[in-house]
Regions:
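Membrane-interface alpha helices of multi-pass inner-membrane proteins
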Residues: 121-122, 126, 165-179, 189-191, ...
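Juxtamembrane membrane-water interface segments immediately following transmembrane helices
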Residues: 32-59, 203-259, 263
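Transmembrane-helix signature of polytopic, membrane-embedded enzymes
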Residues: 15, 89, 103-127, 145-146, ...
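Extracytoplasmic catalytic/substrate-binding loops of multi-pass membrane glycan-assembly enzymes
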Residues: 35-48, 57-58, 63-78, 84-88, ...
Length: 401
């Protein structure tokens, strides 16, 4: 893998341009991080990491937790050893990871789609405003996206070179554990790349290697089967906040002071079931609204909708990538002769991932921009049929290398 990257650096002018752009952006972002400085935004993952660093275990304020899967808090635990400055150190590491993600998206795209589209895809990824900023946030998306891209590159590279498939399998399952909503999508991609009969045992064993230790820990700690993370009823509850009674809200806020997240699931469940049974039409309507939030802008940011930051980071990317996705779907349906069967199946899987993730958030909650960012880069890859479908762009796109 390293030699493959170095070989392309030596031989490909386009790859070097992306690399130098990445180095420039990395330098600017690190100067801003440590020079201005930009204060990193941290949520629960960081506080779990602090407890790990302090030797008190995988905990939050109310004791043991399964609110977050272990990959990202463990990633943060080493920076957490150096106190609050560790936030800056962790952000610096994340900026390096996103620099390498830009290189890997070029490499994977060049294998699958050709080097010229790879140049465009990696350029759009590197300059995507939300992705430029997001490594300043200590939240699992900052690790999920680089891991997902690394998995894709390793899967493409191992298929091209007929290499050992276990490492990309492990990275794929690790990505799914980092962001469990991606598990069905990762499974679909694992089967796409490694679905032959001879790989079935390896797929199962590598999944067990990644998920079993965490599942055993949760069984021993909570006496419950939790292979990923605890919040299920909580996510439904958060999406129903506008409809629950004030008494129910007060009860939940009180319970949160002394219950851990696994215990709280029992408190959320009857509230959610009551909403389903008494206000199902309202729930359906709000689910449709959350779907539009996912694909446009969450309600909590509506009062900032026309500020330059939101226009540049969300409105324009969502609009342009949304139009691109619509056109690409039309081309996949109507211009199948421009795509190989393998590429067609790959792109359909990506569309399926986008649809699945948007439906899950629509059914639960879609209050944060970051929910979309785990998968928004897939829309960049889905621009390929546009390049392939129009004669001039197809000529620019070039051939596979």
């Amino acid at each position: 893998m390293i030699f493959d990257v170095l070989k392309d650096w030596k031989e490909s002018k386009q790859f070097r341009l992306i690399g130098w752009l990445g180095i420039l952006l990395l330098t600017i972002k690190l100067v801003m991080l440590f020079g201005i400085p930009i204060i990193p935004h941290a949520i629960e993952d960081w506080y779990i990491a602090k407890h790990i660093a302090e030797g008190s275990g995988y905990n939050l304020s109310n004791g043991s937790t399964a609110l977050k899967t272990p990959v990202y808090p463990l990633f943060l635990s080493l920076p957490a050893f150096i106190g609050d400055f560790g936030k800056f150190f962790a952000c610096g590491l994340q900026h390096f990871l996103w620099f390498f993600a830009t290189l890997f998206i070029y490499k994977a795209s060049s294998i699958r789609f050709g080097s010229r589209f790879a140049f465009v895809a990696s350029l759009l990824f590197a300059l995507h405003p939300a992705y430029v900023y997001y490594p300043y946030v200590l939240e699992s998306t900052a690790l999920t996206v680089p891991l997902f891209i690394l998995f894709w590159y390793l899967a493409e590279y191992s298929k091209l070179e007929s290499l050992n498939t276990k490492i990309p399998m492990l990275i794929g399952w690790l990505t799914a554990l980092t962001q469990p909503i991606l598990l069905p999508g990762i499974l679909a991609l694992q089967l796409f790349y490694f679905g032959k009969k001879r790989n079935v045992i390896s797929l199962i064993l590598t999944a067990l290697v990644i998920f079993t230790p965490w599942t055993i820990r949760n069984a021993m700690t909570f006496d419950a089967f939790i292979p990923t993370k605890s919040p299920m009823w909580m996510n439904f509850y958060e999406g129903m906040q506008k409809d629950v009674t004030s008494q129910e809200q007060t009860h939940i806020e009180s319970a949160r002071r002394y219950m851990n997240d696994v215990e709280l699931e029992k408190e959320y469940k009857p509230i959610v079931i009551r909403q389903f049974s008494e206000k199902f039409t309202t729930y359906v309507n709000r689910s449709f609204h959350r779907f539009t939030e996912f694909w446009s802008l969450p309600d909590r940011y509506r009062n900032q909708m026309w500020t330059p930051a939101i226009i540049v980071s969300r409105i324009l990317p969502q609009l342009l990538l949304g139009i691109g996705l619509f056109l690409s779907i039309l081309m996949i349906i109507n211009m199948s002769n421009h795509l190989s069967i393998d590429d067609r199946h790959f792109l359909i899987i990506l569309i399926g991932i986008l649809i699945y993730v948007s439906i899950i958030y629509s059914l639960t909650q879609a209050a944060n921009i970051r929910f979309k960012l785990d998968v928004e880069w897939l829309q960049i890859l889905l621009l390929f049929p546009i390049f392939q479908g129009f004669p001039k762009l197809a000529g620019f796109q070039g051939t596979r290398e």
